[in-house]
């Protein structure tokens, strides 16, 4: 079994970045879409940013861990989102 923190670092710096590009840009684009959706759907004034997205994506992974027995990948992803939050956003 590989070291989780090493796997997290590889995931956010290589694997996911190669697929999805720079997380700062990606999270800010997601924030724009989610902001538009929430404003339209619920008629609320809200402005999400990349930091909000990192937190909410981590919360999504935590929710999955509650209902799934095999959750190593969710742990890696949750730590990855929080690492991006702490280091890049």
Residue spans of the language-model regions?
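Intrinsically disordered, low-complexity regulatory regions
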Residues: 1-89
